[in-house]
């Protein structure tokens, strides 16, 4: 998988969405853009998953801070 920063992937994905919404390309070009968008989505989603696994939440129990794994939910 390509080494791409999350922010760069999101920016490229937004550009692809804008191009697809303009409907100015032919079917073959639109399909190619769609496939690239799916690839970028998967890369960005994987990076988010990796980041969530690294995040810990500090919870105060009594007078101590206890580290707990991040348990984020779907929006």
Curated annotation (Swiss-Prot):
The keyword Cytoplasm applies. Keywords: Cytoplasm, Exonuclease, Hydrolase, Nuclease. It is found in: Cytoplasm. Its main location: cytoplasm. It is an enzyme of class 3 (hydrolase). HAMAP family: Exonuc_7_S (MF_00337). This is Exodeoxyribonuclease 7 small subunit. It comes from Alkaliphilus metalliredigens (strain QYMF).
């Amino acid at each position: 998988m390509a080494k791409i920063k999350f922010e760069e992937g999101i920016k490229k994905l937004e550009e692809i969405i804008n191009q697809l919404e303009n409907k100015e390309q032919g079917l073959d070009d639109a399909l190619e853009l769609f496939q690239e968008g799916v690839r970028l989505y998967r890369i960005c989603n994987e990076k988010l998953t990796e980041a969530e696994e690294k995040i810990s939440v500090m919870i105060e129990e009594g007078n101590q801070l206890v580290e707990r794994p991040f348990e984020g939910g779907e929006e």
